From Swiss-Prot:
Encoding gene, per UniProt annotation: Ercc5
Entry protein name: DNA excision repair protein ERCC-5
GO annotation, cellular component aspect: chromosome; nucleotide-excision repair complex
E.C. no: 3.1.-.-
Residues forming coiled coils: none
UniProt: Mg(2+) 1 binding residues: 30, 77, 788, 790
Originating organism: Mus musculus (Mouse)
Motif extent (Nuclear localization signal 1): 1049-1065
Protein function: Single-stranded structure-specific DNA endonuclease involved in DNA excision repair. Makes the 3'incision in DNA nucleotide excision repair (NER). Binds and bends DNA repair bubble substrate and breaks base stacking at the single-strand/double-strand DNA junction of the DNA bubble. Plays a role in base excision repair (BER) by promoting the binding of DNA glycosylase NTHL1 to its substrate and increasing NTHL1 catalytic activity that removes oxidized pyrimidines from DNA.
Subcellular location: Nucleus; Chromosome
One GO term of the biological process aspect: response to UV
Length: 1170
C-alpha cells in the first residue's frame, strides 16, 4: 500500500526514462506488490477471477525484463513487523466482513435474478410486444425521423440472413467442385440436393449442363469401335434430356413460388386454377407475365331433371367442389348408387386436370368439340346415369371431407361406393340380358362375433359404460330408405377383388366387407322409427346394411358369406327447414377375431380403477360445426344391440362407445363362439386371418391411443381457457419500472460482489513457492527478506549492490532508498525515474519528513489522520517546523490545547491553516514513536554477496506453462523467442547518453507544482530550511577564518565579486556568457556564485594551511548548496547584491561589442586620411 498520496506529492520530481536506457543495470524488484496486484486486479472481460493469475503476471513481466536485458533481483516478503501485523489484523477483519457481505450479496443477486425471470415470463404471457418506455412516449419526433420498420424486418437479422446465404453458397461451391473433379459423384436425385433452394439447384444444373456439353470427352472417352458411336451419342442425348427435365422442374418450382400466392388467394375465394405460370418478359427487365390455366369460377349448376349428366358435362359438375349444401344437384330420380370407385374417380380427375401440365392449352372450341364427341360415346353406355350422380356426390363430399373426414375415411368410402355402383350396374345389365356370371371367393371366418351399433347425437347422461372403446372409420350412405341384401353385398366384395386382380394389385379386403359362414349369421332386423326434427337443426343420417334372414337366396345357401358393415360414419350435412326427417335405426354384426380381442385386453388397463378412469367419451376429432363420433360396443350376452339415430342437441354430433362387458365375459364369449365353428372352417388355413386381425388390432389400438392423446390435449386447452389470467389487472408500466429497477440492482450487486471478492483475496505461501519455481526456470536470482521486502530493496540500493528498485510502493523511500523506477509495467504510462536528491532539493523532504507524512497520511504501520491529504500534511509541517518528531509533537500539543480551549475565543493571530486544523480528530498516543523506529531501523539482511544469472530453460518452462496455463509448445515459444533472441545478442557499442548526463533536459522535464497551497507550503519550508542552515554555514566559515587568522582577506573576494563586469570567463558561445549564466536565472547564478566561492575558498585555505577542522563538516557544506539554490529559485525576495550582480552581468556584454565598433570607426578614419 505505502504512504497514501505520497506519489502524487513526488510526481513533480520524476522524469521519464526509456526502458532501453536500463539495459545492463541490476535492479531489485519487490515481487510482493506484484502478487497483490495480480490477485486483486487481474480479471477477465466479465470481471471474474483468472486461474493462476499471479503466475501469468510473473511470466509476462519476467519476459519484459529479460527482453530489455535488465538483470533483476526479486525480493520476497518475510515475516511482518508487529505494527504491520496489527494493521493486517484489522484488514483481515474487514476481509472477513467483506466475505460475509459477499455471500449475502450473492443471495440477493439470486433473488433479483429470479424476480426478473418471473417478470419476463409474465411479459410473455400477457403480451407479445415490449411495453413502450416513458422516454419514447414523452419524446416528440423530429420531422426527419424515419418511419418504423415493418415487424418482419424488425425481427429479421441481416447477419443471420447473410450467414444462411453464405452457407448456401459454400454448399453450392462444394457441389460444383465435386462435380468438376468427378462428374459422376453428384446425385441430383438425393435428398441433400433436393433440400437446396431452387435458385441454387437451377444454377448447379445449368453449370452441369454446360460442363457436360463442352467437356464430355474429358471424363468419358470416345468409343474405340465405330459401331459403338451411336450408343455413345444416345447416352449423351439421354443425359442431356435428363438434365433438361430437372431444369424444367426447378423452373416450375421457382415459378410456383412466385405465383403460389395468386393461386392460394383465388382458391380461398372459391375458384379453381389448373395452373399458374409466371415468367419474365425478355424485352423488359422489370416486367413479368402471369399465365393462368383452367380458371373456373364458383357457380351454381342447375341440372335439368329430364336430361341425364354425361361425360361431356364433367367439368360443369366439378364446379360444385366448393359449393354449399344448398347448391347441390337435385336430380329427378334419387340415385340408388354410392360414389364411384377409386379408378373411376382418378379417371375423372385426370380428365379435369389434363394429362400433363406441359401441354399447351387448347382452345375452348376444340375442347368443347372433344367433349361432345366423348359425350356421345359416354352416352352409349360407358358411364351410367347412376355413375354420373355418384360422381356428383363424390365431388360434393370433398367439401365435407375437410370437416370430418380423413384420408382413411375417403379410401373406405370410395371402396364401398365403387362396390355399390358396380352392383347396380350389374343388375341393369342382367335385366337387359347382358349379365355375366362371376364367382366369389370364400372369406376366412372370424372367431368372435361382436355386434356393432352406431348412434348419432349425444347421450343423455354423457357417460360411457365401455372399458374397451375404440373408433374406426365410417362410411356415409346418402340413401336412407335403401335396403341392401346380403347377396348384393357378396357381389360387391367379389367384384372389388376381381378389379384388384385385373389391375395387378393384391386384393386388399376392406374393413367394410368381412364375412362369416351363413351358419353363424345372426340376422338383425332393422326397425325404422321416424324421428321428429325441429326446424333449422342439423340432422345426421346413418345408413346401416340390413341383413334379411328371409332372403330366399340366403336361405338356399346360394351365397355362403354374410357382409359385415365394419364402420359407418356420420357426415351428412343436409339441413332441413321443417317437417319430419325419418332416420333409420340400423344394426349390423361385426366379427372380431379372438387374437385381436386378447391383444386389446392386454393393451387396456388391468386394474379396476384404471378401467373406471378409462371409461370416458372419446372425441374423434374437433370440427367447427357438426362433429361425428363413433361407438363400437362389444356384444352383450342377451343379444344384439340396436342402433338409433337421434337428433343432436349440441353443436356437434358424436358417437359414444358403450359396453358393460368385462374381460371375463369377453373370454367366455370368445370360447363359446369358438365352439360353434364347423370342422370345415377349422381345417382352413389361418395365416391370412392372423395377419389381418393383428394388423387390424394394431390399427385399432393406435387409433385409440391417438384419440386419448387428442382428448388429453383438448382437456388441457379447456382448462387453460377456463383458468383466470393472474396478470390481467397488472399495469405494464409498473412492470417496466420494476424490471428496470431490478436490472440496475442486479448490475450494482455484481459490481459489489466483485469488489468484495477483491478485498477478501490474500496472498498465500503456495503462491510464493510457485513463483520461486518459475524464477528458477528463468535463471533469475531471488532472496527472502527477513521482514519487509521494501526495506531489503532499499538496503541493496544503499550498499550499491543494485542500481535502483522497480516498485510502485512508496514505503521504500521511508526505508532510505535513493533510486526508484515506477510504472515499468504499465502500458498506459511511461516509465518514471525518481531520485532522492531531486525531491530533496525541490520539495525539501528528507527521510524524517517522509516519516512524518506517513503519520499524517497513513501507511502500513499507522492508520493516519482522517480527512488529511498530502497538501494538508505539507501545511502542517510548514506550520510546525522542527527535526525528527518535533513537528508532530508540537502539532499534537497545540491541538490538545485548542480542544481544551474551544469555549475560549480563538487566537486572532492563528492562520487559516490552524483554524482548519482545529476540526481534525487525533487518535490517542499520536504520534507513536514505534512507527518511526520501524522505518529508521528495519530488520534487513546486510550481507554482501554476488548474484548470478542463468539462461532460461525452455523445455522446463514449456512444461510449466502447460501445467499451469494450459498452453501448448507453440504458444510458449511465441513468448520466449523474442526474449531469447535479445539475450543472445552480443552488443558492445554504448549509447550516447551513457557518456554524460543531460542536466538541461532533466530540468526542462521537471514538472511544476500545480497546487497553489502546496507551492506556498513548499516555498516556506525551503526558506525556513535555508534560514536554519545559514548560521551553521557562517559558523563553519568563521572557524576556518579564525584558524587562518585572515578574516579581512576572506572578505576581499566578496568585494571583488561585486565588480563582476571586469571578470571574463572562457565561453564557447561566441561572446555570450558561460553555461551556468545562460541556463540559470540571475538569482540562481548569484546564489551559486556566492555560496560556491565561499566553499571553494574554504577548501583552498584548509588544504593550504592544513587546519585542524574536521573534514566531516565539509561534506555538510557541500550538501547545503542545493537547498540554498532551490531557495533562491522559490523565494520571491533576494538581496540587493544579487540584483547588482544580475545588472552587471548584462552590462558586461555591451562594452565587448562597443569596443569592436570603436575599432572599426578608427580604422575607417585612418583609411580616409590616407
Amino acid at each position: 500500500m505505502g504512504v497514501q498520496g505520497l506519489w502524487k506529492l513526488l510526481e513533480c520530481s520524476g522524469h521519464r526514462v526509456s526502458p532501453e536506457a536500463l539495459e545492463g543495470k541490476v535492479l531489485a524488484v519487490d515481487i510482493s506488490i506484484w502478487l497483490n496486484q495480480a490477485l486483486k486486479g487481474v480479471r477477465d472481460s466479465h470481471g471474474n477471477v483468472i486461474e493462476n493469475a499471479h503466475l501469468l503476471t510473473l511470466f509476462h513481466r519476467l519476459c519484459k525484463l529479460l527482453f530489455f536485458r535488465i538483470r533483476p533481483i526479486f525480493v520476497f516478503d518475510g515475516d511482518a513487523p508487529l505494527l504491520k501485523k496489527q494493521t493486517l489484523a484489522k484488514r483481515r477483519q474487514r476481509k472477513d466482513s467483506a466475505s460475509i457481505d459477499s455471500r449475502k450479496t450473492t443471495e440477493k443477486l439470486l433473488k433479483t435474478f429470479l424476480k426478473r425471470q418471473a417478470l419476463k415470463t409474465a411479459f410473455r404471457s400477457s403480451r407479445h410486444e415490449a411495453p413502450p418506455s416513458l422516454t419514447q412516449v414523452q419524446r416528440q419526433d423530429d420531422i426527419y425521423v424515419l418511419p418504423p420498420l415493418p415487424e418482419e424486418e424488425k425481427h429479421s437479422s441481416e447477419e443471420e440472413d447473410e450467414k444462411q446465404w453464405q452457407a448456401r453458397m459454400d454448399q453450392k461451391q462444394a457441389l460444383q467442385e465435386e462435380f468438376f473433379h468427378n462428374p459422376q459423384a453428384i446425385d441430383i436425385e438425393s435428398e441433400d440436393f433436393s433440400s437446396l433452394p431452387p435458385e441454387v439447384k437451377h444454377e448447379i444444373l445449368t453449370d452441369m449442363k454446360e460442363f457436360t456439353k463442352r467437356r464430355r470427352t474429358l471424363f468419358e472417352a470416345m468409343p474405340e469401335e465405330s459401331n459403338d458411336f451411336s450408343q455413345y451419342q444416345l447416352k449423351g442425348l439421354l443425359k442431356k434430356n435428363y438434365l433438361n427435365q430437372h431444369i424444367e422442374n426447378v423452373q416450375k418450382e421457382m415459378n410456383q413460388q412466385h405465383s403460389g400466392q395468386i393461386q392460394r388467394q383465388y382458391q380461398d375465394e372459391g375458384g379453381f386454377l389448373k395452373e399458374v405460370e409466371s415468367r419474365r418478359v425478355v424485352s423488359e427487365d422489370t416486367s413479368h407475365y402471369i399465365l393462368i390455366k383452367g380458371i373456373q369460377g364458383k357457380k351454381v349448376m342447375d341440372v335439368d331433371s329430364e336430361s341425364l349428366p354425361s361425360s361431356s358435362n364433367v367439368h360443369s359438375v366439378s364446379s360444385n367442389l366448393k359449393s354449399s349444401p344448398h347448391e347441390k344437384v337435385k336430380p329427378e330420380r334419387e340415385p340408388e348408387a354410392a360414389p364411384p370407385s377409386p379408378r373411376t374417380l382418378l379417371a375423372i380427375q385426370a380428365a379435369m386436370l389434363g394429362s400433363s401440365s406441359e401441354d399447351e392449352p387448347e382452345s375452348r372450341e376444340g375442347r368443347q368439340s372433344k367433349e361432345r364427341n366423348s359425350g356421345a360415346t359416354a352416352d352409349a353406355g360407358s358411364i351410367s346415369p347412376r355413375t354420373c350422380a355418384a360422381i356428383q356426390k363424390a365431388l360434393d363430399d370433398d367439401n365435407d371431407e375437410k370437416v370430418s373426414g380423413s384420408s382413411d375415411d375417403l379410401a373406405e368410402k370410395m371402396l364401398l361406393g365403387s362396390g355399390l355402383e358396380q352392383e347396380e350396374h350389374a343388375d341393369e345389365t342382367a335385366e337387359r340380358g347382358g349379365g355375366v356370371p362371376f364367382d366369389t371367393a370364400p372369406l376366412t371366418p372370424s372367431v368372435t362375433e361382436v355386434k356393432e351399433c352406431v348412434t348419432s347425437g349425444s347421450s343423455a347422461n354423457g357417460q360411457t359404460d365401455s372399458a374397451h372403446s375404440f373408433t374406426t372409420a365410417s362410411h356415409r350412405c346418402d340413401t336412407p330408405k335403401e335396403t341392401v341384401s346380403l347377396a348384393r353385398a357378396v357381389k360387391e366384395a367379389s367384384q372389388i377383388s376381381s378389379e384388384c386382380e385385373v389391375e395387378g394389385r393384391p386384393a386388399a379386403l376392406s374393413p367394410a366387407f368381412i364375412g362369416t359362414p351363413s351358419s353363424h349369421v345372426s340376422g338383425v332386423l332393422s326397425e325404422r322409427e321416424p324421428t321428429l326434427a325441429p326446424p333449422t337443426t342439423r340432422t345426421h343420417s346413418d345408413q346401416g346394411i340390413d341383413i334379411h334372414p328371409e332372403d330366399p337366396e340366403l336361405q338356399n345357401g346360394l351365397y355362403p358369406l354374410e357382409t359385415k358393415c365394419n364402420s359407418s360414419r356420420l357426415s351428412s350435412d343436409d339441413e332441413t327447414e321443417g317437417g319430419q326427417n325419418p332416420a333409420p335405426k340400423a344394426c349390423s354384426t361385426v366379427h372380431v377375431p379372438a387374437e385381436a380381442m386378447s391383444n386389446l385386453e392386454n393393451a387396456l388397463p388391468s386394474n379396476a380403477e384404471e378401467r373406471g378412469d378409462f371409461q370416458e367419451t372419446i372425441q374423434l376429432r374437433e370440427v367447427p360445426e357438426a362433429a361425428a363420433r363413433e361407438l363400437i360396443s362389444a356384444p352383450k350376452p342377451m343379444g344384439p344391440m340396436e342402433m338409433e339415430s337421434e337428433e343432436s342437441e349440441s353443436d356437434g354430433s358424436f358417437i359414444e362407445v358403450q359396453s358393460v362387458v368385462s374381460n371375463s365375459e369377453l373370454q367366455t364369449e370368445s370360447s363359446e363362439a369358438s365352439t360353434h365353428l364347423s370342422e370345415k372352417d377349422a381345417e382352413e388355413p389361418r395365416e391370412t386371418l392372423e395377419e389381418g386381425t393383428s394388423r387390424d388390432t394394431e390399427c385399432l389400438l393406435q387409433d385409440s391411443s391417438d384419440i386419448e392423446a387428442m382428448e388429453g390435449h383438448r382437456e388441457a386447452d379447456i382448462d387453460a381457457e377456463d383458468m383466470p389470467n393472474e396478470w390481467q389487472d397488472i399495469n405494464l408500466e409498473e412492470l417496466d419500472a420494476l424490471e428496470s429497477n431490478l436490472l440496475a440492482e442486479q448490475n450494482s450487486l455484481k459490481a459489489q460482489k466483485q469488489q468484495q471478492d477483491r478485498i477478501a483475496a490474500s496472498v498465500t505461501g503456495q503462491m510464493f513457492l510457485e513463483s520461486q519455481e518459475l524464477l528458477r526456470l528463468f535463471g533469475v536470482p531471488y532472496i527472502q527478506a527477513p521482514m519487509e521486502a521494501e526495506a531489503q530493496c532499499a538496503m541493496l540500493d544503499l550498499t550499491d549492490q543494485t542500481s535502483g528498485t522497480i516498485t510502485d510502493d512508496s514505503d521504500i523511500w521511508l526505508f532510505g532508498a535513493r533510486h526508484v523506477y515506477k510504472n515499468f509495467f504499465n502500458k498506459n504510462k511511461f516509465v518514471e525515474y525518481y531520485q532522492y536528491v531531486d525531491f530533496y532539493s525541490q520539495l525539501g523532504l528528507d527521510r524524517n519528513k517522509l516519516i512524518n507524512l506517513a503519520y499524517l497520511l497513513g501507511s502500513d504501520y499507522t492508520e493516519g489522520i482522517p480527512t488529511v491529504g498530502c497538501v494538508t500534511a505539507m501545511e502542517i509541517l510548514n506550520e510546525f517546523p522542527g527535526r525528527g518528531l518535533d513537528p508532530l509533537l508540537k502539532f499534537s500539543e497545540w491541538w490538545h490545547e485548542a480542544q481544551n480551549n474551544k469555549k475560549v475565543a480563538e487566537n486572532p493571530y492563528d492562520t487559516k491553516v490552524k483554524k482548519k486544523l482545529r476540526k481534525l480528530q487525533l487518535t490517542p498516543g499520536f504520534p507513536n514513536p514505534a512507527v518511526a523506529d520501524a522505518y529508521l531501523r528495519p530488520v534487513v539482511d546486510d550481507s554482501r554477496g554476488s548474484f548470478l544469472w542463468g539462461k532460461p530453460d525452455v523445455d522446463k518452462i514449456s512444461t510449466f506453462c502447460q501445467r499451469y496455463f494450459g498452453w501448448n509448445r507453440m504458444k510458449t515459444d511465441e513468448s520466449l523467442y523474442p526474449v531469447l533472441k535479445h539475450l543472445n545478442a552480443h552488443q558492445t557499442q554504448l549509447r550516447i547518453d551513457s557518456f554524460f548526463r543531460l542536466a538541461q533536459q532533466e530540468k526542462q522535464d521537471a514538472k511544476l507544482i500545480k497546487s497553489h497551497r502546496l507551492n506556498r507550503a513548499v516555498t516556506c519550508i525551503l526558506r525556513k530550511e535555508r534560514e536554519e542552515k545559514a548560521p551553521e554555514l557562517t559558523k563553519v566559515t568563521e572557524a576556518l577564518d579564525d584558524a587562518k587568522g585572515k578574516t579581512q582577506k576572506r572578505e576581499l573576494p566578496y568585494k571583488k565579486e561585486t565588480s563582476v563586469p571586469k571578470r571574463r570567463r572562457p565561453s564557447g558561445n561566441g561572446g555570450f556568457l558561460g553555461d551556468p549564466y545562460c541556463s540559470e536565472s540571475p538569482q540562481e547564478s548569484s546564489c551559486e556564485d556566492g555560496e560556491g566561492s565561499s566553499v571553494m575558498s574554504a577548501r583552498q585555505r584548509s588544504a593550504a594551511e592544513s587546519s585542524k577542522i574536521s573534514c566531516s563538516d565539509v561534506p555538510d557544506l557541500v550538501r547545503d548548496p542545493p537547498h540554498g539554490r532551490q531557495g533562491c529559485v522559490s523565494t520571491s525576495s533576494s538581496s540587493e547584491d544579487d540584483e547588482d550582480k544580475a545588472k552587471t552581468v548584462l552590462v558586461t556584454a555591451r562594452p565587448v561589442f562597443g569596443k569592436k565598433k570603436l575599432k572599426l570607426k578608427s580604422m575607417k578614419r585612418r583609411k580616409k586620411k590616407t
